[in-house]
Amino acid sequence: MSQNSLRLVEDKSVDKSKALEAALSQIERSFGKGSIMKLGSNENVVEIETISTGSLGLDIALGVGGLPRGRIIEIYGPESSGKTTLALQTIAEAQKKGGICAFVDAEHALDPVYARKLGVDLQNLLISQPDTGEQALEITDTLVRSGAVDVLVVDSVAALTPRAEIEGEMGDSLPGLQARLMSQALRKLTASISKSNTMVIFINQIRMKIGVMFGSPETTTGGNALKFYASVRLDIRRIGAVKEREEVIGNQTRVKVVKNKMAPPFKQVEFDIMYGEGVSKTGELVDLGVKAGIVEKSGAWFSYNSQRLGQGRENAKTFLRDNPDLAREIELSLRQNAGLIADRFLQNGGPDPDDGDGDATAEM
């Protein structure tokens, strides 16, 4: 009796494997070779290609060393919080590695002088200033399908005005039009983005939901589709000013990883964005060095390997700026301790009751 049952189990497993082989060969005949495969058979699938954000702390907080390629990224926050700066820094980092980048300027507000100061190569940056939302997303789709673009930035979702709204009268009520436009575009784009390995960054603005009593009243524009399709969502906020005596020379900025499909989310990092310079790399080295225990802080003095960096944070930053070899050495040590620093970022962050993922139908 036991032998019969064993033979029955063996026969079933043989039948299953034959049926699976037949199904796979039929799929490949219908849709082409490579349309279905075992995940482990393609080693390239396991590797996550990334591009640096220009911020060492944010690269560590993202868990994979930067923003992932072949994915949709959303950067949102209040006005003048550093959204476009962060996107331009990512473009600059991609261009340093020989990447081709494009900027779809739906807001018609890109400052080329500021972009150059951030390290963007304007000669090799593709730029489009579309008239309508449909035109912007069609240009995005064409560039992504070409497979030649490494990073594409759309600035911003709120400025993607549907053609019907532009051609209509001022004050016309067209509820849900932009949300439908975004939903349709993302359905069409998502497969092309993955196949072409293009990183598409959508910059978004914040609106207030009406009549919210509990939780955050904030939401992002363009409906809910982008929240689902985005692999990484970054919430960027200005939390203070960087001053030199009485003059404001930059912003203290906090970025929270609200969503991350590549690594644990809810990590948050703080860094300085200096006017005309971008993310302060030396400031990050000092702050992250203290957090990781690589840079020692005794009172107001900062030191590294018994070498004094300076009294006060600004003096330590100046010392590292004047000594690039020492700055590189500290950066190398920080990258080796990335796991420890990432764990400490996770302790600082945490899921808010509502991280802007609420219903986007009622917007001010």
UniProtKB/Swiss-Prot annotation:
What is a GO molecular function of this protein?
ATP-dependent DNA damage sensor activity
Entry keyword annotation includes Cytoplasm: yes
Q: An example of a Gene Ontology BP annotation on this entry?
A: DNA recombination
User: Binding positions for ATP?
Assistant: G77, P78, E79, S80, S81, G82, K83, T84
Stretch list, region Disordered: 343-364
Reported function: Can catalyze the hydrolysis of ATP in the presence of single-stranded DNA, the ATP-dependent uptake of single-stranded DNA by duplex DNA, and the ATP-dependent hybridization of homologous single-stranded DNAs. It interacts with LexA causing its activation and leading to its autocatalytic cleavage.
Q: What is this protein called?
A: Protein RecA
Identify the species of origin: Rhizobium johnstonii (strain DSM 114642 / LMG 32736 / 3841) (Rhizobium leguminosarum bv. viciae)
* Lineage, broadest ranks: Bacteria, Pseudomonadati, Pseudomonadota, Alphaproteobacteria, Hyphomicrobiales
